[in-house]
């Protein structure tokens, strides 16, 4: 479907997110956090890069997270699937977000000749459904501590709109 798009793309926003306490795999056998936060945006960006506006106005925006810090010891390139290491939802989330952030630098070099911009933005703490399938303790903690201190999704949407539409960038 994506390869068949004919119009140029002005703005591409990668805004999917998930947090899982227990290791899950996609239908293709990939660890879900890594597939969603890194592999999917990477593949979609590579597929659609030729469609990005080449008139120095094309933009790619990754919705990142300070959660990349949960992978503070770096990516275990020998175990991106979390098959050998003990699974940690926070570390898996961090690994996916760190890989996403690092890939942004690769894409920036590829896009430089066209003048397209690429940004990662941390939306802050936002009330979302992320983690809704986790256990009771996580749900309680999210409801009582995270969500009560989090902004409405519309606030993050304003920042995304600015990155996508501002002529100053």
Task: Indicate where each model-derived feature is located.
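Charged, amphipathic alpha-helical interaction segments
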Residues: 46, 50, 136, 161-165
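Proteins with a high burden of low-complexity, intrinsically disordered sequence enriched in S/T/G/P/A and R
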Residues: 1-5, 36, 137, 163-169
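A short C-terminal helix-loop "cap" of Rossmann-like NAD(P)-dependent dehydrogenase/epimerase domains
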Residues: 82-84, 136-146
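C-terminal helical subdomain
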Residues: 96, 143-169
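Rossmann-fold NAD(P)H-dependent dehydrogenase/reductase core
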Residues: 1-132
